[in-house]
């Protein structure tokens, strides 16, 4: 579907952001993100596009001239959250002349014209495949004085060929692919984001290098199924390569200044030993693996079209722990999939007990229109789902605490975060992530080289363990100031210029050089 397609010769398409038309201040914007890490990264691209078009980020507490929602469609409450928020904004918009509201992302791709039917005060609706159209659509909506809805069925531009304004001075997302070739019966994502298309390795590494050149020390490689990377390169000159992801991980190990590399999410059916070997043998690959289980019942896995069974899943974990003994393993689990029996659920509990996950993202199944599972007749009653969910949560919480107790007395290295703890102001603590991804709240006293900033690196001794975090109150053992910390202190975040090839386009030249190092950077 392509509703109201763009026309390059449309007089509204070339208008700048409204605030600049008569010498007034630039219009302000805010991007609100619902959903997964892929959406967070897409929102960085949206921010980059808007700033390139002349918008500026709204100040905290200010009412922006433009609000962009980047939405999720995975669970039912995502719909409710969006439309509830849009309802609250109706009066705000009426009291703020010229304000615009745009809705994009997976829910917009799914609902299309339904968005403006439910919320007629929305100005622009765009999908997952045409985020580059947003500035044009905003100008056209103002020019035509009506909502502009543009949803396209295939990717117009690979997101990496768009500019990005990053959210963090010290950690960055880098997409390795878009789309997914799996057909899980509960998941709507493939129908919204399309078939998998993989970036060239050189383009990915160029983007990683651009981030590192600006002080970023941790990068997370993103894809709907990262370990399938290499099955369908967007560059037709590159041949299919089943070992491409392990090669990419090893190449990241050669980037000087890149201290931590993570990736998400893999798929158990395609997770291979060469990736585990690359993790074990590449020092900057973090000892952390997110491996979605979804269910411990082989019967349910078959109904989900998850092309692995519990024995294979546990065998992967065994191999990871044999080669990376200190690895932290996290997972996703769905409770109450249609037809799930008590026996099926018990199988999930059994796998969770054996797997000893560091943490688990547990979800109560919610039917998504357009997915096969939504039409299954044997939906599990809500009350039963809730009871099972609570049992699973109790089991996983016990395991989390037992595993975290093992860290008491150990020394861990932390990349200091901005925020991270709801009680940090009251407890006078700061927060950071260990190399294995565990969240640690620490007291910033001891061996400190000036103020500790987000992006700096500290080592601490763990003194207490809770189910979902560790505490280190014995003081800081070492503190290393970093360029990322320098940038955090002055509110500077990286920007990345367009990198790589567009879809079906020939190769382009070298990426635009990264911005120069700020004068106050320590260079370490």
Swiss-Prot record:
<comment type="function">
    <text>Catalyzes the methylthiolation of N6-(dimethylallyl)adenosine (i(6)A), leading to the formation of 2-methylthio-N6-(dimethylallyl)adenosine (ms(2)i(6)A) at position 37 in tRNAs that read codons beginning with uridine.</text>
</comment>
<keyword id="KW-0479">Metal-binding</keyword>
<feature type="binding site">
    <location>
        <position position="36"/>
    </location>
    <ligand>
        <name>[4Fe-4S] cluster 1</name>
    </ligand>
</feature>
<feature type="binding site">
    <location>
        <position position="187"/>
    </location>
    <ligand>
        <name>[4Fe-4S] cluster 2</name>
    </ligand>
</feature>
<dbReference type="GO" id="GO:0051539">
    <property type="term" value="F:4 iron, 4 sulfur cluster binding"/>
</dbReference>
<keyword id="KW-0963">Cytoplasm</keyword>
<feature type="domain" description="TRAM">
    <location>
        <begin position="405"/>
        <end position="476"/>
    </location>
</feature>
<dbReference type="InterPro" id="IPR005839">
    <property type="entry name" value="Methylthiotransferase"/>
</dbReference>
<feature type="compositionally biased region" description="Basic and acidic residues">
    <location>
        <begin position="1"/>
        <end position="12"/>
    </location>
</feature>
<dbReference type="InterPro" id="IPR002792">
    <property type="entry name" value="TRAM_dom"/>
</dbReference>
<keyword id="KW-0408">Iron</keyword>
<dbReference type="Pfam" id="PF04055">
    <property type="entry name" value="Radical_SAM"/>
</dbReference>
<keyword id="KW-0808">Transferase</keyword>
<keyword id="KW-0411">Iron-sulfur</keyword>
<keyword id="KW-0004">4Fe-4S</keyword>
<dbReference type="Pfam" id="PF00919">
    <property type="entry name" value="UPF0004"/>
</dbReference>
<feature type="binding site">
    <location>
        <position position="180"/>
    </location>
    <ligand>
        <name>[4Fe-4S] cluster 2</name>
    </ligand>
</feature>
<feature type="domain" description="Radical SAM core">
    <location>
        <begin position="166"/>
        <end position="402"/>
    </location>
</feature>
<protein>
    <recommendedName>
        <fullName>tRNA-2-methylthio-N(6)-dimethylallyladenosine synthase</fullName>
        <ecNumber>2.8.4.3</ecNumber>
    </recommendedName>
</protein>
<keyword id="KW-0819">tRNA processing</keyword>
<dbReference type="GO" id="GO:0046872">
    <property type="term" value="F:metal ion binding"/>
</dbReference>
<dbReference type="InterPro" id="IPR006638">
    <property type="entry name" value="Elp3/MiaA/NifB-like_rSAM"/>
</dbReference>
<feature type="region of interest" description="Disordered">
    <location>
        <begin position="1"/>
        <end position="23"/>
    </location>
</feature>
<dbReference type="InterPro" id="IPR020612">
    <property type="entry name" value="Methylthiotransferase_CS"/>
</dbReference>
<dbReference type="InterPro" id="IPR023404">
    <property type="entry name" value="rSAM_horseshoe"/>
</dbReference>
<feature type="binding site">
    <location>
        <position position="106"/>
    </location>
    <ligand>
        <name>[4Fe-4S] cluster 1</name>
    </ligand>
</feature>
<keyword id="KW-0949">S-adenosyl-L-methionine</keyword>
<comment type="subunit">
    <text>Monomer.</text>
</comment>
<feature type="binding site">
    <location>
        <position position="72"/>
    </location>
    <ligand>
        <name>[4Fe-4S] cluster 1</name>
    </ligand>
</feature>
<dbReference type="GO" id="GO:0035597">
    <property type="term" value="F:N6-isopentenyladenosine methylthiotransferase activity"/>
</dbReference>
<feature type="binding site">
    <location>
        <position position="184"/>
    </location>
    <ligand>
        <name>[4Fe-4S] cluster 2</name>
    </ligand>
</feature>
<dbReference type="GO" id="GO:0005829">
    <property type="term" value="C:cytosol"/>
</dbReference>
<feature type="domain" description="MTTase N-terminal">
    <location>
        <begin position="27"/>
        <end position="143"/>
    </location>
</feature>
<dbReference type="InterPro" id="IPR013848">
    <property type="entry name" value="Methylthiotransferase_N"/>
</dbReference>
<dbReference type="InterPro" id="IPR007197">
    <property type="entry name" value="rSAM"/>
</dbReference>
<comment type="similarity">
    <text>Belongs to the methylthiotransferase family. MiaB subfamily.</text>
</comment>
<dbReference type="InterPro" id="IPR006463">
    <property type="entry name" value="MiaB_methiolase"/>
</dbReference>
<dbReference type="InterPro" id="IPR038135">
    <property type="entry name" value="Methylthiotransferase_N_sf"/>
</dbReference>
